[in-house]
């Protein structure tokens, strides 16, 4: 394993890598934007490929752990949630009484989400905001919950995004992050590596005509911090009661924390 392929630690460093490629910090955001402009229309298919179809079950687990109340004026911010997948689940779990704000830096992803919200009759319950997770355009203590699924590994400065999450949450607010993680079962890890590095780029080329985008997504998963390291990063910005659950042999992990 080389320095380029090692996972980052608690001190961060994702801003200097585009997958396994070392880059200048200033390049990171525009390069990631290019990936998601490319895959926006096929985003659910992309997650099906990356997770072997398991992402739907994991997202349901995330919303179940959040347990959104069926009360009006309860507000959730879903970051990097452009297509609305998490927000729709949360709204339905709250019996369509909660209000969701979906924030994404990528306009193509938001466009997909807006169309889906209108199609599903959820548009009145959702605001779509194009902005950066590192600089949220909201006042302090604005939300009851902050969710982010398969997005934080694409943020250049993860520590800054976590600080912003803490800032905009109300006291007693909940943070939940679902992300691909460090597989802890050796045999499963080998099988998943074979799938990821050999099959996924080829399928990405076939389905979305962009194998390079899918190769980046696979490599970015392998660069993301291990579960305990990410938990430490969450705790470091001020969150309390930080915990995580491994999902499907730790192919993914769900981190939870509270602002107390």
Swiss-Prot record:
SUPFAM superfamilies: S-adenosyl-L-methionine-dependent methyltransferases
Pfam families cross-referenced by the UniProt entry: Ubie_methyltran
InterPro entries from the UniProt entry: SAM-dependent_MTases_sf (IPR029063), UbiE/COQ5_MeTrFase (IPR004033), UbiE/COQ5_MeTrFase_CS (IPR023576)
GO molecular function: 2-methoxy-6-polyprenyl-1,4-benzoquinol methyltransferase activity; demethylmenaquinone methyltransferase activity
Catalytic activity: a 2-demethylmenaquinol + S-adenosyl-L-methionine = a menaquinol + S-adenosyl-L-homocysteine + H(+); a 2-methoxy-6-(all-trans-polyprenyl)benzene-1,4-diol + S-adenosyl-L-methionine = a 5-methoxy-2-methyl-3-(all-trans-polyprenyl)benzene-1,4-diol + S-adenosyl-L-homocysteine + H(+)
Binding locations of S-adenosyl-L-methionine: 83, 104, 132-133
Coiled coil: none
EC number: 2.1.1.163, 2.1.1.201
Metabolic or biological pathway: Quinol/quinone metabolism; menaquinone biosynthesis; menaquinol from 1,4-dihydroxy-2-naphthoate: step 2/2; Cofactor biosynthesis; ubiquinone biosynthesis
Keywords of the record: Menaquinone biosynthesis, Methyltransferase, S-adenosyl-L-methionine, Transferase, Ubiquinone biosynthesis
UniProt record similarity statement: Belongs to the class I-like SAM-binding methyltransferase superfamily. MenG/UbiE family.
Chain's role: Methyltransferase required for the conversion of demethylmenaquinol (DMKH2) to menaquinol (MKH2) and the conversion of 2-polyprenyl-6-methoxy-1,4-benzoquinol (DDMQH2) to 2-polyprenyl-3-methyl-6-methoxy-1,4-benzoquinol (DMQH2).
HAMAP family given in the database record: MenG_UbiE_methyltr
Protein name per Swiss-Prot or TrEMBL: Ubiquinone/menaquinone biosynthesis C-methyltransferase UbiE
Organism (species): Bartonella henselae (strain ATCC 49882 / DSM 28221 / CCUG 30454 / Houston 1) (Rochalimaea henselae)
Lineage: Bacteria, Pseudomonadati, Pseudomonadota, Alphaproteobacteria, Hyphomicrobiales
Gene assigned in the entry: ubiE
């Amino acid at each position: 394993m080389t320095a380029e392929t090692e996972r980052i630690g608690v001190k961060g460093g994702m801003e200097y890598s585009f997958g396994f490629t070392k880059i200048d910090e200033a390049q990171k955001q525009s390069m990631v934007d290019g990936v998601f402009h490319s895959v926006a229309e096929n985003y659910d298919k992309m997650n099906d490929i990356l997770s072997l179809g398991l992402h739907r079950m994991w997202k349901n687990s995330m919303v179940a752990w959040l347990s959104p109340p069926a009360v009006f004026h309860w507000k959730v911010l879903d970051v990097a949630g452009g297509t609305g997948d998490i927000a729709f689940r949360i709204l339905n779990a709250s019996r369509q009484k909660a209000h969701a704000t979906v924030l994404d830096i990528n306009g193509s992803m938001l466009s997909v989400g807006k169309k889906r919200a209108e199609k599903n009759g959820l548009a009145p319950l959702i605001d779509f905001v194009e902005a950066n997770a590192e600089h949220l355009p909201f006042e302090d203590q604005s939300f009851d919950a902050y969710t982010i699924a398969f997005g934080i590994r694409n943020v250049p400065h993860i520590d800054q995004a976590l600080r912003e999450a803490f800032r905009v949450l109300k006291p007693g607010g909940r943070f939940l992050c679902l992300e691909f993680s460090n597989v802890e079962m050796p045999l499963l890890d080998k099988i998943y590596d074979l799938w990821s590095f050999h099959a996924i780029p080829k399928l990405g080329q076939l389905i979305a005509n962009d194998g390079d985008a899918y190769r980046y997504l696979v490599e970015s998963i392998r660069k993301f911090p291990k579960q305990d390291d990410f938990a430490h990063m969450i705790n470091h910005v001020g969150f309390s009661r930080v915990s995580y659950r491994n999902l499907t042999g730790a192919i993914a992990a769900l981190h939870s924390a509270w602002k107390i």
